Amino acid sequence: MNVEFPDSETLRGTNDVESEELPRFARASRERDLDSIEDVEAAAREAIADLPFDSLAPGAEVAITAGSRGIHDMPALLEGAVDALRERGFEPSVIAAMGSHGGATSEGQRETLEALGITEERLNCSIRTSMAVESVGEDSLGREVYVAEDALDADGVILANRIKPHTDFHGPVESGLCKMAVIGLGKHRGAESLHNAGLAADFSEVIRERAELIVEESPVVGGIGLIENAADRATHVEGVPADAILDREPELLDVAREELPTLPVEELDLLVVDELGKEISGTGMDTNVIGRVLFHGEDEPDSPRITRIYARSITPASHGNGLGLGLADFVHRDVVDELTLDDMYVNIVTSGEPSRARIPFTVPDDLTALLLACSTTGVAEPAELRVARIESTMKPDELLVSEPVARELDGRADVEVGELRPLAFEDGALSPLD
């Protein structure tokens, strides 16, 4: 982006705070008792066994959805499901199911899956990425409901997705199998139609209604729901027949809420996020972790209470799509330089919330962001800044925290706090978190 932002000297001159006045920092690590599935491929095979295939003849094509999120165990789940289908005599395939992600193009969606380790070579089956859709009916608002032609051409479809609280809205159905049916299989047109309808009615109910129509009018045989623990590992995998999805998904969502990763601290002046990205969250940063939603018609969370957020970088897998950047208050100039506005704006229009595409206050380096936080958080003394730094919102249990936060966490049975040290900078850049 060809914009000339102020340099560090100009910005640091807006206050008289020196780096030596910043608080000392310590590593903090929260320990959790987490259950996880050791063999996800085997769990996927068991899930396939719970789905009804009686109506399908040998050799039938059964397509499994694959989304754009960086779900650690999804490649293994897909491998197990594909192998199980082949062993049953079916012809498995995978459908790229990610709304408008990947620039809303066939090649872009294929590249998105490749970046996540989901390839034809690994799965030994075809991956279909056509953006073509057909209408299968209208919802109660009179709006078209779309399904990918690749799904309609298959003999059977399995909705595979992580079930978790959504970053935009809350209700009995959030991110999961129903959303995969509506937005994933709906491709760009379906996602745009859904998000637009969601601005006029209850988002969760719109998804539920549309998912019911899609299950009725397309060859969906069921779904495989995956629930992650706070360390982003599969803790539950379940096959859900098509006629049980609407009843079972809300129950699985309640289970997922109990596993939701959160910060170990409720109140911060500044949260430093090393990476935001589309494979981390659809909003770049998980709104349930940062305590910000900024979505039309949705209330802001009561906690955590974070005054300022600084985003340091964007992941390569995002391909410059910085949707969600508007959730931050400060952003490193390198992030702005890497933005691909074509993809970002297509995605933001589809999602229906332009405020999340706003480019925050842009800083040339990390030190400048920290010094400016002293002037923009209401803290009287720099040494009292309550700061936490995390790699991403997928890893909120591993932090670097300022001394006031370290004092608060020290002594908690579930948190280990290390030695306090001054921050180290090289040409204004923080040293690596690890």
Question: What are the residue ranges of the model-derived segments?
Answer:
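N-terminal amphipathic/basic leader segments beginning at the initiator methionine
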Residues: M1-A43
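Short glycine-rich or small-residue beta-strand-to-loop segments that form or flank ligand, phosphate
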Residues: E61-G70, S93-M98, A388
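Conserved, well-structured core segments that form the ligand-binding/active-site neighborhood
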Residues: V147-G277
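An acidic, phosphate/nucleotide-engaging active-site surface
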Residues: G108-P172
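Membrane helical hairpin/interfacial module
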Residues: I71, P75, A81-T119
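Glycine-rich phosphate/diphosphate-binding loops that line cofactor/substrate pockets in enzymes
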Residues: A47-A63, R86-G89, P264-V265
